A protein has these predicted regions:
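N-terminal ligand-binding/catalytic initiation module
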Residues: 1-163
Length: 163
């Protein structure tokens, strides 16, 4: 269908360096193709275009002090993908490979996972490129405190429920 291809081209143009996100969007759009083709109202309401664009993306620095007294700086992310059904809901991932593309892809998939519960929850996801492996409990605590010092401004029970 032309619409699916048009939307995929827009997504690729806007997100050229986000392979994980592009793969997830491609797979989902291809899987819902029959429903979109049968229902003109979805096309007219630009459902696909709204589905693939996050409502909000937040990227921030996370400075923290390691056990040697050295300042470390990591990146933090929160993608608030869709709140059509309720507040954003989705967990946090701390792993050295975390980047905007991965968090965006996870937030995109979280929308569908949450919608299947029947509960009024939207979809979101957050995380950081912080690697907790090999870190002391105190280092993990200091990192998490710094991470939440920024993230708390963007989450809450009626807005975004970060797990």
């Amino acid at each position: 269908m032309v619409l699916i291809q048009e939307v995929l081209e827009i997504v690729k143009k806007r997100n050229p360096n986000e392979p994980e996100f592009l793969q997830a969007v491609t797979e989902v759009l291809e899987s819902i193709r029959p429903g979109i083709e049968r229902n003109k109202k979805y096309r007219d309401a630009k459902i696909l275009e709204r589905l693939v664009e996050p409502e909000r993306m937040i990227q921030f620095r996370v400075p923290w002090i390691d056990d040697n007294g050295q300042i470390q700086v990591n990146r933090g992310f929160r993608v608030q993908m869709n709140s059509a059904l309720g507040p954003y809901k989705g967990g946090l991932r701390f792993h050295p490979t975390v980047c905007a593309s991965i968090i965006k892809f996870l937030a995109f998939e979280q929308v569908f996972k949450n919608s299947l519960t029947g509960l009024p929850m939207g979809g979101g996801k957050g995380g950081s490129d912080f690697d907790p492996k090999g870190k002391s409990d105190r280092e993990v605590m200091r990192f998490c405190q710094s991470f939440m010092t920024e993230l708390f401004r963007h989450v809450g029970p009626h807005t975004d429920v970060a797990e």
